Amino acid sequence: MARAKFERNKPHVNIGTIGHVDHGKTTLTAAITMTLAALGRAKAKKYDEIDQAPEEKARGITINTAHVEYETEKRHYAHVDCPGHADYVKNMITGAAQMDGAILVVSAADGPMPQTREHILLARQVGVPNIVVFLNKKDQLDDPELLELVELEVRELLSKYDFPGDDVPIVAGSALMALEKMASEPKLIRGKDDWVDCIYSLMDAVDAYIPTPERAIDKPFLMAVEDVFSITGRGTVATGRIERGKVKVGETIELVGIRGTRSTTVTGLEMFQKSLDEGLAGDNIGVLLRGIKKEDVERGMVLAKPGSITPHTQFEGEVYILSKEEGGRHTPFFAGYRPQFYVRTTDVTGTIVTFTDDEGKSAEMVMPGDRIKMTVELINPIAIEDGMRFAIREGGRTVGAGVVSKILK
Protein backbone atom coordinates (compact mmCIF):
# COMPACT_ATOMS: atom_id res chain seq x y z
CA MET A 1 0.00 0.00 0.00
CA ALA A 2 2.81 2.40 0.87
CA ARG A 3 4.06 2.26 -2.72
CA ALA A 4 0.87 3.68 -4.27
CA LYS A 5 1.08 6.64 -1.93
CA PHE A 6 4.71 7.25 -2.88
CA GLU A 7 3.83 7.33 -6.58
CA ARG A 8 1.23 10.01 -6.01
CA ASN A 9 3.84 12.27 -4.44
CA LYS A 10 5.78 12.60 -7.67
CA PRO A 11 4.89 15.59 -9.83
CA HIS A 12 2.69 14.57 -12.75
CA VAL A 13 3.46 15.67 -16.32
CA ASN A 14 1.57 14.98 -19.55
CA ILE A 15 3.68 14.36 -22.63
CA GLY A 16 3.36 12.75 -26.04
CA THR A 17 5.31 11.69 -29.11
CA ILE A 18 4.91 13.79 -32.27
CA GLY A 19 6.54 13.67 -35.71
CA HIS A 20 6.32 12.32 -39.26
CA VAL A 21 4.69 8.99 -40.07
CA ASP A 22 7.10 6.00 -39.80
CA HIS A 23 9.84 7.99 -38.07
CA GLY A 24 9.42 5.76 -35.00
CA LYS A 25 7.02 7.45 -32.56
CA THR A 26 5.27 4.24 -31.50
CA THR A 27 8.50 2.22 -31.42
CA LEU A 28 10.01 4.87 -29.13
CA THR A 29 6.94 4.83 -26.88
CA ALA A 30 7.27 1.03 -26.57
CA ALA A 31 11.03 1.31 -25.95
CA ILE A 32 10.49 3.80 -23.10
CA THR A 33 8.00 1.50 -21.35
CA MET A 34 10.24 -1.57 -21.80
CA THR A 35 13.32 0.26 -20.52
CA LEU A 36 11.62 1.71 -17.44
CA ALA A 37 9.80 -1.58 -16.76
CA ALA A 38 13.20 -3.09 -15.87
CA LEU A 39 13.20 -0.73 -12.86
CA GLY A 40 9.56 -1.45 -12.00
CA ARG A 41 8.59 2.07 -13.11
CA ALA A 42 6.37 1.12 -16.05
CA LYS A 43 4.29 -1.67 -17.46
CA ALA A 44 6.11 -2.94 -20.56
CA LYS A 45 4.01 -2.40 -23.68
CA LYS A 46 4.70 -4.02 -27.03
CA TYR A 47 4.51 -2.05 -30.27
CA ASP A 48 1.23 -3.74 -31.27
CA GLU A 49 -0.45 -2.91 -27.95
CA ILE A 50 0.26 0.78 -28.51
CA ASP A 51 -0.41 0.75 -32.25
CA GLN A 52 -3.93 -0.66 -31.86
CA ALA A 53 -5.10 2.43 -30.06
CA PRO A 54 -8.72 2.50 -28.89
CA GLU A 55 -11.17 5.06 -30.23
CA GLU A 56 -12.22 7.93 -28.01
CA LYS A 57 -14.56 10.83 -28.45
CA ALA A 58 -13.55 14.40 -27.70
CA ARG A 59 -15.83 17.31 -28.55
CA GLY A 60 -17.87 15.07 -30.82
CA ILE A 61 -14.84 13.87 -32.77
CA THR A 62 -13.57 10.30 -32.84
CA ILE A 63 -9.83 9.99 -32.25
CA ASN A 64 -7.57 6.98 -31.88
CA THR A 65 -5.14 7.54 -29.03
CA ALA A 66 -2.90 5.25 -27.01
CA HIS A 67 -2.19 6.22 -23.41
CA VAL A 68 0.73 4.76 -21.49
CA GLU A 69 2.10 5.75 -18.11
CA TYR A 70 5.54 5.43 -16.63
CA GLU A 71 7.79 6.97 -14.01
CA THR A 72 11.30 8.27 -13.87
CA GLU A 73 13.10 8.80 -10.59
CA LYS A 74 11.69 12.32 -10.42
CA ARG A 75 8.24 12.22 -12.05
CA HIS A 76 5.13 10.38 -13.08
CA TYR A 77 4.29 10.70 -16.80
CA ALA A 78 1.16 10.15 -18.82
CA HIS A 79 2.25 9.68 -22.42
CA VAL A 80 0.03 9.80 -25.49
CA ASP A 81 0.80 8.32 -28.90
CA CYS A 82 -1.48 8.41 -31.94
CA PRO A 83 -1.41 5.86 -34.75
CA GLY A 84 -2.39 8.13 -37.64
CA HIS A 85 -1.50 11.65 -38.72
CA ALA A 86 -5.16 12.74 -38.76
CA ASP A 87 -5.46 11.53 -35.15
CA TYR A 88 -2.59 13.81 -34.16
CA VAL A 89 -4.17 16.82 -35.80
CA LYS A 90 -7.52 16.13 -34.09
CA ASN A 91 -5.88 15.33 -30.76
CA MET A 92 -3.84 18.50 -30.62
CA ILE A 93 -6.69 20.73 -31.72
CA THR A 94 -9.36 19.29 -29.42
CA GLY A 95 -6.93 19.11 -26.51
CA ALA A 96 -8.20 15.57 -25.92
CA ALA A 97 -4.72 14.85 -24.65
CA GLN A 98 -3.34 18.09 -23.26
CA MET A 99 0.45 18.05 -23.51
CA ASP A 100 2.81 19.88 -21.14
CA GLY A 101 5.60 18.95 -23.51
CA ALA A 102 6.31 16.75 -26.51
CA ILE A 103 9.01 14.41 -27.74
CA LEU A 104 9.54 15.20 -31.42
CA VAL A 105 10.74 12.04 -33.17
CA VAL A 106 12.77 12.62 -36.35
CA SER A 107 14.37 9.84 -38.37
CA ALA A 108 18.07 10.65 -38.65
CA ALA A 109 18.09 8.66 -41.90
CA ASP A 110 15.44 10.90 -43.53
CA GLY A 111 15.63 14.24 -41.74
CA PRO A 112 12.61 16.52 -41.17
CA MET A 113 9.62 15.71 -43.39
CA PRO A 114 6.29 17.54 -44.11
CA GLN A 115 4.50 16.19 -41.02
CA THR A 116 7.52 17.03 -38.86
CA ARG A 117 6.95 20.65 -39.82
CA GLU A 118 3.18 20.41 -39.45
CA HIS A 119 3.43 18.92 -35.95
CA ILE A 120 5.87 21.64 -34.84
CA LEU A 121 3.52 24.30 -36.24
CA LEU A 122 0.54 22.67 -34.50
CA ALA A 123 2.46 22.44 -31.22
CA ARG A 124 3.15 26.18 -31.49
CA GLN A 125 -0.47 27.05 -32.40
CA VAL A 126 -2.16 24.93 -29.73
CA GLY A 127 0.26 25.90 -26.98
CA VAL A 128 2.46 22.85 -26.35
CA PRO A 129 5.08 24.79 -24.39
CA ASN A 130 8.20 22.62 -24.71
CA ILE A 131 9.75 20.16 -27.15
CA VAL A 132 12.57 17.64 -26.69
CA VAL A 133 13.93 15.94 -29.83
CA PHE A 134 14.79 12.28 -30.35
CA LEU A 135 16.81 11.63 -33.53
CA ASN A 136 15.85 8.05 -34.26
CA LYS A 137 17.30 5.33 -36.54
CA LYS A 138 20.87 6.40 -35.77
CA ASP A 139 21.87 2.77 -36.47
CA GLN A 140 21.10 3.40 -40.17
CA LEU A 141 23.68 6.21 -40.46
CA ASP A 142 27.34 5.50 -41.22
CA ASP A 143 28.46 9.12 -41.35
CA PRO A 144 28.38 11.15 -38.10
CA GLU A 145 28.39 14.36 -40.16
CA LEU A 146 24.96 13.44 -41.54
CA LEU A 147 23.64 13.28 -37.98
CA GLU A 148 24.97 16.79 -37.34
CA LEU A 149 23.29 18.05 -40.50
CA VAL A 150 19.92 16.60 -39.49
CA GLU A 151 20.30 18.09 -36.01
CA LEU A 152 21.01 21.48 -37.56
CA GLU A 153 17.95 21.19 -39.82
CA VAL A 154 15.72 20.30 -36.88
CA ARG A 155 17.01 23.22 -34.80
CA GLU A 156 16.38 25.64 -37.68
CA LEU A 157 12.86 24.29 -38.14
CA LEU A 158 12.08 24.68 -34.42
CA SER A 159 13.42 28.25 -34.42
CA LYS A 160 11.30 29.07 -37.48
CA TYR A 161 8.18 28.29 -35.43
CA ASP A 162 9.34 30.26 -32.37
CA PHE A 163 10.67 27.39 -30.29
CA PRO A 164 14.17 27.99 -28.84
CA GLY A 165 15.90 25.85 -31.49
CA ASP A 166 19.39 26.45 -30.11
CA ASP A 167 18.47 25.33 -26.58
CA VAL A 168 16.17 22.36 -27.25
CA PRO A 169 17.81 19.13 -26.05
CA ILE A 170 18.43 16.65 -28.88
CA VAL A 171 19.18 13.00 -28.10
CA ALA A 172 20.16 10.56 -30.86
CA GLY A 173 19.58 6.82 -30.71
CA SER A 174 17.64 3.91 -32.11
CA ALA A 175 14.28 3.07 -30.57
CA LEU A 176 14.17 -0.26 -32.43
CA MET A 177 17.63 -1.34 -31.25
CA ALA A 178 16.75 -0.43 -27.66
CA LEU A 179 13.41 -2.21 -27.92
CA GLU A 180 14.97 -5.40 -29.33
CA LYS A 181 17.67 -5.38 -26.64
CA MET A 182 15.09 -4.96 -23.84
CA ALA A 183 12.90 -7.68 -25.37
CA SER A 184 15.81 -10.13 -25.24
CA GLU A 185 16.94 -9.00 -21.75
CA PRO A 186 13.94 -7.52 -19.89
CA LYS A 187 15.93 -6.85 -16.70
CA LEU A 188 18.72 -4.90 -18.42
CA ILE A 189 19.59 -1.69 -16.56
CA ARG A 190 21.47 1.51 -17.41
CA GLY A 191 25.13 1.27 -18.36
CA LYS A 192 24.94 -2.15 -20.06
CA ASP A 193 23.95 -1.22 -23.62
CA ASP A 194 24.50 1.96 -25.62
CA TRP A 195 21.12 1.89 -27.37
CA VAL A 196 19.23 1.39 -24.11
CA ASP A 197 21.29 4.18 -22.52
CA CYS A 198 20.03 6.56 -25.24
CA ILE A 199 16.49 6.00 -23.91
CA TYR A 200 17.68 6.89 -20.39
CA SER A 201 19.40 10.01 -21.77
CA LEU A 202 16.16 11.01 -23.49
CA MET A 203 14.19 10.64 -20.24
CA ASP A 204 16.85 12.66 -18.40
CA ALA A 205 16.37 15.43 -20.98
CA VAL A 206 12.57 15.29 -20.60
CA ASP A 207 12.90 15.39 -16.79
CA ALA A 208 15.25 18.37 -16.89
CA TYR A 209 13.87 20.41 -19.78
CA ILE A 210 10.08 20.09 -19.62
CA PRO A 211 8.95 22.11 -16.58
CA THR A 212 6.38 20.76 -14.14
CA PRO A 213 3.12 22.48 -15.13
CA GLU A 214 1.41 24.91 -12.82
CA ARG A 215 -1.42 23.02 -11.14
CA ALA A 216 -4.97 24.09 -11.98
CA ILE A 217 -5.57 25.00 -8.34
CA ASP A 218 -2.72 27.54 -8.35
CA LYS A 219 -4.09 29.46 -11.35
CA PRO A 220 -6.52 32.40 -11.05
CA PHE A 221 -10.10 31.39 -10.26
CA LEU A 222 -12.45 30.69 -13.17
CA MET A 223 -15.84 28.99 -13.37
CA ALA A 224 -18.07 28.87 -16.45
CA VAL A 225 -21.72 29.38 -15.55
CA GLU A 226 -23.87 26.38 -16.48
CA ASP A 227 -27.09 27.31 -14.74
CA VAL A 228 -28.58 30.08 -12.63
CA PHE A 229 -31.46 30.27 -10.18
CA SER A 230 -32.65 32.49 -7.35
CA ILE A 231 -33.15 31.52 -3.73
CA THR A 232 -35.87 33.58 -2.07
CA GLY A 233 -34.42 35.87 0.57
CA ARG A 234 -30.84 34.93 -0.25
CA GLY A 235 -30.19 36.01 -3.82
CA THR A 236 -28.88 34.58 -7.04
CA VAL A 237 -26.90 31.36 -7.36
CA ALA A 238 -24.71 30.50 -10.36
CA THR A 239 -23.73 26.86 -10.72
CA GLY A 240 -20.89 25.23 -12.65
CA ARG A 241 -17.61 23.39 -12.37
CA ILE A 242 -14.58 25.34 -11.20
CA GLU A 243 -12.14 25.14 -14.12
CA ARG A 244 -9.16 26.47 -12.17
CA GLY A 245 -8.09 28.18 -8.98
CA LYS A 246 -10.14 28.48 -5.82
CA VAL A 247 -12.81 30.77 -4.44
CA LYS A 248 -13.66 31.75 -0.86
CA VAL A 249 -16.76 33.24 0.72
CA GLY A 250 -16.33 37.03 0.99
CA GLU A 251 -14.09 37.36 -2.07
CA THR A 252 -14.75 39.84 -4.87
CA ILE A 253 -15.11 38.23 -8.28
CA GLU A 254 -16.09 39.37 -11.76
CA LEU A 255 -18.92 38.23 -13.98
CA VAL A 256 -17.48 38.28 -17.51
CA GLY A 257 -18.94 37.88 -20.99
CA ILE A 258 -22.06 38.51 -23.09
CA ARG A 259 -22.99 41.83 -21.43
CA GLY A 260 -19.89 43.56 -20.20
CA THR A 261 -18.08 42.89 -16.95
CA ARG A 262 -19.60 43.30 -13.46
CA SER A 263 -18.05 43.00 -10.05
CA THR A 264 -19.77 41.13 -7.21
CA THR A 265 -19.03 39.48 -3.86
CA VAL A 266 -19.36 35.78 -3.08
CA THR A 267 -21.79 35.56 -0.16
CA GLY A 268 -22.03 31.78 -0.03
CA LEU A 269 -20.80 28.52 -1.58
CA GLU A 270 -22.70 25.26 -1.74
CA MET A 271 -21.81 21.76 -2.84
CA PHE A 272 -24.13 18.74 -2.55
CA GLN A 273 -26.61 20.91 -0.61
CA LYS A 274 -23.99 21.68 2.04
CA SER A 275 -22.36 25.05 2.51
CA LEU A 276 -18.59 25.38 2.44
CA ASP A 277 -15.96 28.11 2.89
CA GLU A 278 -13.87 27.42 -0.18
CA GLY A 279 -14.40 25.87 -3.62
CA LEU A 280 -11.46 24.27 -5.46
CA ALA A 281 -10.63 23.44 -9.09
CA GLY A 282 -12.73 20.46 -10.17
CA ASP A 283 -15.61 21.12 -7.75
CA ASN A 284 -19.17 21.33 -9.06
CA ILE A 285 -20.50 24.18 -7.01
CA GLY A 286 -23.19 26.80 -6.49
CA VAL A 287 -21.95 30.36 -5.92
CA LEU A 288 -24.25 32.86 -4.20
CA LEU A 289 -23.71 36.35 -5.64
CA ARG A 290 -24.41 39.63 -3.83
CA GLY A 291 -26.56 42.29 -5.51
CA ILE A 292 -27.04 40.32 -8.72
CA LYS A 293 -30.46 39.55 -10.19
CA LYS A 294 -31.21 36.22 -11.83
CA GLU A 295 -31.66 37.94 -15.20
CA ASP A 296 -28.15 39.47 -14.90
CA VAL A 297 -26.52 36.04 -15.19
CA GLU A 298 -26.75 33.51 -18.00
CA ARG A 299 -25.11 30.34 -19.20
CA GLY A 300 -21.92 31.17 -21.08
CA MET A 301 -20.73 33.87 -18.72
CA VAL A 302 -17.81 33.10 -16.44
CA LEU A 303 -17.08 33.97 -12.82
CA ALA A 304 -13.41 34.86 -12.47
CA LYS A 305 -10.75 36.49 -10.35
CA PRO A 306 -10.92 40.25 -11.12
CA GLY A 307 -8.76 41.23 -14.09
CA SER A 308 -7.77 37.66 -14.96
CA ILE A 309 -9.88 37.27 -18.12
CA THR A 310 -11.54 39.71 -20.53
CA PRO A 311 -14.36 39.41 -23.06
CA HIS A 312 -13.53 39.41 -26.77
CA THR A 313 -15.32 39.17 -30.10
CA GLN A 314 -12.50 38.54 -32.58
CA PHE A 315 -9.86 35.85 -32.60
CA GLU A 316 -7.73 33.62 -34.81
CA GLY A 317 -8.11 29.89 -34.42
CA GLU A 318 -6.49 26.71 -35.66
CA VAL A 319 -9.38 24.49 -36.74
CA TYR A 320 -10.04 20.94 -37.92
CA ILE A 321 -13.22 20.53 -40.00
CA LEU A 322 -14.80 17.09 -39.73
CA SER A 323 -15.00 14.94 -42.84
CA LYS A 324 -18.32 13.64 -44.13
CA GLU A 325 -17.44 10.16 -42.78
CA GLU A 326 -16.96 11.61 -39.30
CA GLY A 327 -20.46 13.08 -39.35
CA GLY A 328 -19.37 16.51 -40.53
CA ARG A 329 -20.55 18.63 -43.43
CA HIS A 330 -20.94 17.12 -46.88
CA THR A 331 -20.12 20.36 -48.71
CA PRO A 332 -17.40 23.02 -48.47
CA PHE A 333 -17.98 26.43 -46.91
CA PHE A 334 -16.77 29.89 -47.87
CA ALA A 335 -15.80 33.10 -46.06
CA GLY A 336 -18.89 34.59 -44.43
CA TYR A 337 -20.08 31.19 -43.13
CA ARG A 338 -21.98 31.67 -39.83
CA PRO A 339 -22.03 28.62 -37.56
CA GLN A 340 -22.27 28.43 -33.74
CA PHE A 341 -19.07 28.41 -31.72
CA TYR A 342 -19.44 26.29 -28.60
CA VAL A 343 -17.24 27.92 -25.98
CA ARG A 344 -17.04 26.32 -22.50
CA THR A 345 -20.78 26.01 -21.76
CA THR A 346 -22.61 27.82 -24.54
CA ASP A 347 -23.13 28.30 -28.27
CA VAL A 348 -22.37 31.76 -29.68
CA THR A 349 -23.03 32.67 -33.29
CA GLY A 350 -19.99 33.89 -35.16
CA THR A 351 -18.86 34.67 -38.68
CA ILE A 352 -15.79 33.10 -40.25
CA VAL A 353 -14.28 36.21 -41.79
CA THR A 354 -11.20 34.77 -43.52
CA PHE A 355 -9.19 31.57 -43.64
CA THR A 356 -5.64 30.74 -44.68
CA ASP A 357 -3.51 27.61 -45.10
CA ASP A 358 -0.23 26.91 -43.25
CA GLU A 359 1.74 29.10 -45.63
CA GLY A 360 -0.54 32.05 -44.90
CA LYS A 361 -2.11 31.91 -48.36
CA SER A 362 -5.78 32.78 -48.51
CA ALA A 363 -7.90 29.73 -49.33
CA GLU A 364 -10.92 29.85 -51.64
CA MET A 365 -13.03 27.48 -49.57
CA VAL A 366 -12.79 24.94 -46.78
CA MET A 367 -13.52 21.29 -47.50
CA PRO A 368 -14.71 18.71 -44.96
CA GLY A 369 -11.57 17.04 -43.52
CA ASP A 370 -9.39 20.18 -43.87
CA ARG A 371 -7.24 21.79 -41.19
CA ILE A 372 -7.25 25.55 -41.51
CA LYS A 373 -6.42 28.79 -39.72
CA MET A 374 -9.40 31.13 -39.49
CA THR A 375 -10.41 34.54 -38.21
CA VAL A 376 -13.72 34.53 -36.33
CA GLU A 377 -16.00 37.37 -35.28
CA LEU A 378 -18.58 36.58 -32.57
CA ILE A 379 -21.88 38.44 -32.22
CA ASN A 380 -21.46 38.68 -28.41
CA PRO A 381 -18.28 39.28 -26.42
CA ILE A 382 -17.26 36.10 -24.58
CA ALA A 383 -14.47 35.41 -22.06
CA ILE A 384 -11.76 34.02 -24.34
CA GLU A 385 -8.06 33.33 -23.88
CA ASP A 386 -5.18 31.91 -25.90
CA GLY A 387 -5.13 28.13 -26.01
CA MET A 388 -8.84 27.83 -25.27
CA ARG A 389 -10.71 25.05 -27.08
CA PHE A 390 -14.02 25.39 -28.87
CA ALA A 391 -16.29 23.35 -31.10
CA ILE A 392 -17.97 24.55 -34.29
CA ARG A 393 -21.58 23.44 -34.51
CA GLU A 394 -24.36 23.65 -37.00
CA GLY A 395 -27.89 22.83 -35.91
CA GLY A 396 -26.60 21.11 -32.77
CA ARG A 397 -24.12 18.78 -34.48
CA THR A 398 -20.37 19.24 -34.35
CA VAL A 399 -18.79 20.13 -37.69
CA GLY A 400 -15.37 21.19 -36.45
CA ALA A 401 -13.07 21.71 -33.50
CA GLY A 402 -10.62 24.49 -32.85
CA VAL A 403 -8.26 26.21 -30.49
CA VAL A 404 -7.76 29.96 -30.06
CA SER A 405 -4.27 30.81 -31.34
CA LYS A 406 -4.47 34.62 -31.11
CA ILE A 407 -6.93 37.16 -29.70
CA LEU A 408 -7.55 40.09 -32.04
CA LYS A 409 -10.19 42.28 -30.39
Swiss-Prot record:
Its EC number is 3.6.5.3. Gene3D superfamilies: P-loop containing nucleotide triphosphate hydrolases, Translation factors. Residues 174-176 are annotated as: G5. PROSITE patterns: G_TR_1 (PS00301), G_TR_2 (PS51722). It is found in: Cytoplasm. Its main location: cytoplasm. Residues 19-26 are annotated as: G1. It catalyses: GTP + H2O = GDP + phosphate + H(+). CDD domains: EF_Tu, EFTU_II, EFTU_III. GO terms for biological process: translational elongation. The keyword Secreted does not apply. Keywords: Cytoplasm, Elongation factor, GTP-binding, Hydrolase, Magnesium, Metal-binding, Nucleotide-binding, Protein biosynthesis. Residues 81-84 are annotated as: G3. It comes from the Bacteria. The keyword Cytoplasm applies. One of its GO terms (cellular component) is cytoplasm. GTP binds at residues 19-26, 81-85, 136-139. GTP hydrolase that promotes the GTP-dependent binding of aminoacyl-tRNA to the A-site of ribosomes during protein biosynthesis. Belongs to the TRAFAC class translation factor GTPase superfamily. Classic translation factor GTPase family. EF-Tu/EF-1A subfamily. PANTHER family: ELONGATION FACTOR TU, MITOCHONDRIAL, ELONGATION FACTOR TU-RELATED. HAMAP family: EF_Tu_B (MF_00118_B). This is Elongation factor Tu.
